[in-house]
Regions:
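Conserved thiamine diphosphate
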Residues: 1-86, 111
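Thiamine diphosphate
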Residues: 5-6, 57-195
Length: 195
């Protein structure tokens, strides 16, 4: 889904899948970061009840997790600890966000990177604790700005901790043909855009 469809173009480049599926009652939605996480998630999800959707990266996914990684159902992962800003990313955008975290660190900005592995249900506790600590948040997703991670985080904050949310997302556009790196640039999803 998303830009990992690359040269298959718009017919394979779903930027609205999460938004559509979030509206289905009892649906659980995972946005996997890399192959290691996909493998771990499938092993656990097979033993759960109810409908699940796993958004799986294609061959272009940059590895984030190693073989010692342990996936926890419906939990976000804190990838880096920080005090100045919270970056909540999902799927392939976790790797891009990690690059941005390193650039910010060079400037003395401490970013906490959270991998929102589950978009529905959202791990509100982990995400909210981080946002309350930093008081600044940006979401990063390989999905339409409408109905995905940005929407889920914003909906939570409206009720629990009103705060402006910055976003890196596909800005209400359709997919198109291109190489992974070209599409990252075209849709403004690069680590430089996050930075």
């Amino acid at each position: 889904p998303g830009i990992t469809a690359e040269l298959n173009g718009g017919t394979h480049m779903s930027f609205e899948d999460i938004a559509t599926l979030r509206s289905i009652p009892t649906m659980t939605i995972y946005d996997a970061v890399d192959d290691t996480q996909v493998y771990q998630a499938i092993k656990q999800i097979m033993n759960t009840d109810g409908p699940c959707y796993i958004r799986m990266p294609r061959k272009t996914a940059q590895p984030v997790y190693d073989e010692n990684y342990k996936f926890a159902l419906n939990k976000a992962d804190v990838i880096t600890k920080g005090n100045d800003i919270t970056i909540v990313a999902s799927g392939i955008m976790v790797a891009e966000s990690l690059k941005a975290v390193l650039k910010l660190k060079e400037e003395g900005i401490s970013a906490e990177l959270i991998s929102a592995n589950t978009i529905k249900p959202l791990d509100e506790e982990t995400i909210l604790n981080s946002i309350k600590k930093t008081n600044h948040v940006v979401t990063c997703e390989n999905h339409n700005v409408i109905g995905g991670l940005y929407s889920a985080v914003s909906e939570m904050l409206i009720e629990k901790y009103p705060l402006h949310v910055d976003k890196i997302a596909v800005m209400d556009q359709f997919g198109q043909v291109g190489k992974y790196s070209e599409l990252l640039n075209y849709y403004h999803l690069t680590s430089n855009d996050i930075y």
